């Protein structure tokens, strides 16, 4: 049975703004207080989805969340009507209001970790929504994420959508941004690669000194257990703490994998040679031949990688076996990074094509092409069981573009977050969207 990788991109929400909430994410904190353009952000994301769909890749959409999250504000002691809750939070705790209004769920690489049926003990596709415990504004996402995923992957004979891990620092989980999978074919058993920043209980592992390590070893191990993965099909690796301190807050900022290929920086992992050898051995046992493409720091420094988001790219398998790499415009703006990419495409290796997308609205918050998508490997029967309304088509693209035009502002400044009308606009937009995507009632305001 044929199998495919489907990329489910996050649809940017109506409250997309620059509040600088993500300590350790250099782009996020560098653009704090700038005015954003939610309409442009959503359209940039949609254009990437449509372009890849037009190239023949399987593409889906993951809905944004209700923001501001009034329920979270109420839990923090802000009372009254919805408008009064927002007004009081704006006056007494504007940073908390900004966190409750964040559109960060657009980066669906953090939505969940996904294991395909070929890897799991029960033969189902498994999803574990990430608790995103390290940042308050992201930690409130997972209940809605789970409801949305269950509306998309509703057939419980084929799909298992777990609850998030305990929302506690020892099990800090950032989802697929620290996970990739190697395989000879998407429908064959593969090797799942879990990257962590620190261990919560084992003091032998080093930790970064400046920025937090958001993913723990214990969280990665728990997800592997939940998904029923075998030891023969799992590799754990620790990200180099120095790269975390250089702004590599998720592993998808310093490496990207697909199929039998890992594209990574020289300083991506601790004990890098041993890590690569373990992947190669385990993949060979599952019928694959591993290729590691290592970018030397002499050609691209960690700092250049962070600024350009070279590794926060998408590797996509083309017919014939070669791969396309999707990078943000910032890579073309860096002379050394662009020079490296041109050399890479001409090298005769597995990556032979580079595609550039303008994702500036997302990039200014620290999210490139890889951040915006959740990869789900599905066989034909599983793909047929997915809610068809969330799969990209010419009609869905036109419908979503019109939806954005009707509901999104083209400018959102920090002071606008105090406007109670923003909540009304967001709820109206999402109520219509659940109809377009066939999700049913998934948002708190719909469930009240």
Swiss-Prot record:
Signal peptide: none annotated. Pathway: Amino-acid degradation; L-arginine degradation via AST pathway; L-glutamate and succinate from L-arginine: step 2/5. Keywords: Arginine metabolism, Hydrolase. Gene3D superfamilies: Succinylarginine dihydrolase. Its EC number is 3.5.3.23. The active site is at residues 174, 250, 371. SUPFAM superfamilies: Pentein (SSF55909). It holds the Pfam family AstB. Substrate binds at residues 19-28, 110, 137-138, 214, 252, 365. It comes from the Bacteria. InterPro entries: AstB_sf, SuccinylArg_d-Hdrlase_AstB. It catalyses: N(2)-succinyl-L-arginine + 2 H2O + 2 H(+) = N(2)-succinyl-L-ornithine + 2 NH4(+) + CO2. Homodimer. Belongs to the succinylarginine dihydrolase family. Catalyzes the hydrolysis of N(2)-succinylarginine into N(2)-succinylornithine, ammonia and CO(2). PANTHER family: N-SUCCINYLARGININE DIHYDROLASE. This is N-succinylarginine dihydrolase.
